[in-house]
Amino acid sequence: MANQGQRVSWGDESTKIRGRSNSRGRKSNNIPLSFFNPITLQQGSKFWNLCPRDFVPKGIGNRDQQIGYWNRQTRYRMVKGQRKELPERWFFYYLGTGPHADAKFKDKLDGVVWVAKDGAMNKPTTLGSRGANNESKALKFDGKVPGEFQLEVNQSRDNSRSRSQSRSRSRNRSQSRGRQQSNNKKDDSVEQAVLAALKKLGVDTEKQQQRSCSKSKERSNSKTRDTTPKNENKHTWKRTAGKGDVTRFYGARSSSANFGDSDLVANGSSAKHYPQLAECVPSVSSILFGSYWTSKEDGDQIEVTFTHKYHLPKDDPKTEQFLQQINAYARPSEVAKEQRKRKSRSKSAERSEQEVVPDALIENYTDVFDDTQVEMIDEVTN
């Protein structure tokens, strides 16, 4: 029966022209959110020529529901009043969901590319779309991903918002700086007149200021708290790494203490990536209740050994940083070379950021994957 749907079979397909038509699309300001992170397409490439016909992300739905479409999102940024085109992003939606929820499988729509796994049912799924408070999922596929496709990773919405607010604050500061300078001149003349009047009355303002400063320093010194870890008279396994060389407490790097490159060992908790590395370490309760423990006598002490296995997400940048620290002492030249590469990439990224300084009030782009904040144009142009 037609309303029951049919199994998808690509056996009769001979072309890759999918999801293109001559009709004009409409702008939409209320686009449902995709379950997955988007794909950013390399500029100059055509998504429909590169996308495999079974290019359905893994992780949601049953076998019958592995069917849907990729929806194009055109983007731009305003730079000094000029529109600067940005690479397209493509979001995946299951059949019967998203901005084209009423479309049938293989309907010709601008900015839409239909995909399905062999054996999926060509009827609307009941999977819906992502809630605004839920994070989008990382893209994973069974087959090979075209080189022109960049699979995006999650970025913090709070970070994006804070960058926008920071730009706004910076602009406000620059606008008010001129007013402040003119006001300061008036304030200086008033201050000079007051000081002259006090001097005539025999009040020594300089000595009073000096006494006030000395009292402030005394108060600040008394409130300063020493944050250096107290490691004296503690067992090695109870010590805490502070700022500075950790070999004082844990010894030089070796086969039995093989974590940390020269920078991390020399700087301890003040090393640049220490907070990210610490996030990859299990908690005390995980070690206590999720480890295999053994013990044996060692003279007048007991030697305790535990084995703990856990998994880190492969696509998390912190995981790569963490893995580079394992056995780093045994390959110092390789580690130094990799660190130079990272610094070079970081400087290149900073330069590219400085080249484009968008106006936060007219910017129509966000690096947080929220489709509702970006203009959608369904028309495909060659």
From Swiss-Prot:
The modification Phosphoserine is found at residues 9, 156, 254, 256. Residues 1-29, 150-240, 329-358 are annotated as: Disordered. GO terms for molecular function: RNA binding. Residues 224-337 form the CoV N CTD domain. InterPro entries: N_prot_C_CoV (IPR044344), N_prot_N_CoV (IPR044345), NCAP_aCoV (IPR042548), Nucleocap_CoV (IPR001218), Nucleocapsid_C (IPR037179), Nucleocapsid_N (IPR037195). Residues 33-159 are annotated as: RNA-binding. The keyword RNA-binding applies. GO terms for cellular component: host cell endoplasmic reticulum-Golgi intermediate compartment; host cell Golgi apparatus; host cell nucleolus; ribonucleoprotein complex; viral nucleocapsid. Residues 201-235 have a biased composition (Basic and acidic residues). This is Nucleoprotein. The lineage of its organism: Viruses, Riboviria, Orthornavirae, Pisuviricota, Pisoniviricetes.
